[in-house]
A protein has these predicted regions:
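Hydrophobic anchor at the beta1->P-loop junction of P-loop NTPases
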Residues: 7
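Conserved substrate/cofactor phosphate-moiety recognition/catalytic segment
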Residues: 23-64
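Conserved lysine of the Walker
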Residues: 15
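Glycine-rich phosphate-binding loop used to anchor ATP phosphates in small-molecule kinases
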Residues: 58-111, 126
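Pre-Walker A (Motif I) flank of P-loop NTPase domains
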Residues: 1-4
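A glycine- and Lys/Arg-enriched "phosphate-lid" helix/loop adjacent to the NTP-binding pocket
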Residues: 96-163
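Walker A (P-loop) phosphate-binding loop of P-loop NTPases
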Residues: 12
Length: 182
């Protein structure tokens, strides 16, 4: 049984807040690699940033996602992922970037649990910060790109309702229990 549970959606939809709550509850979680790449690149004065070199940024995310998958699949326990390699494919579509065959192959080969939880755009909680420079319209387009990307790779999506963090966590855990994933 695949026990790697993915959260996806546009930026600023509450994925990371739910991940933080799951960590508090004792669950293993894989943090979002996009933010990690941005922080590293800013610290190094690098170019692999979404506002400098989108292809290099995507390629760095793919490398990190592969490492994440390899590390966390060995835990043999439930792990929640704040995005995964399929998001890199969706990002490529969103930004009209050329998609290398290696990325398509990796999305086919590196698998996560089905279903995937998708967080819809939620303007009331959307906010920019040092790493998130997109506006809400881009968040909506990102959400649509993720729907297409995950469907392309055969994942069922469960939309997480817009409600409190605790209610979202309970919603997710109940769906996983219903499917006997926990």
């Amino acid at each position: 049984m695949n026990n790697l549970i993915v959260f996806t959606g546009g930026p600023g939809a509450g994925k990371t807040s739910v991940i933080e709550k799951l960590i508090e509850l004792g669950y293993a979680c894989a943090p979002e690699v996009g933010r990690k790449v941005i922080k590293q690149q800013v610290a190094l004065d690098g170019d692999a940033l979404p506002w400098k070199d989108k292809i290099a940024f995507r390629d760095e995310m793919v490398r990190e996602e592969k490492k994440h998958h390899q590390t966390f699949e060995q835990l043999n326990e439930l792990v929640f992922f704040d995005r995964c390699i399929v998001d890199s494919y969706g990002y490529s579509q969103l930004e009209n970037l050329p998609i290398p065959q290696a990325l398509m192959d990796a999305c086919q080969r590196i698998r996560y649990a089905n279903p995937v939880f998708i967080f819809p755009p939620w303007e009331a909680i959307f906010a920019n910060d040092e790493e998130r420079k997109q506006d809400f319209a881009v968040a909506v387009r990102t959400y649509q790109a993720m729907i297409e990307a995950y469907h392309q790779y055969g994942y069922e999506l469960i939309e997480v309702p817009t409600m409190s963090i605790e209610q979202r966590v309970n919603f997710i855990l109940e769906r996983l229990k219903d499917r006997q994933l926990i």
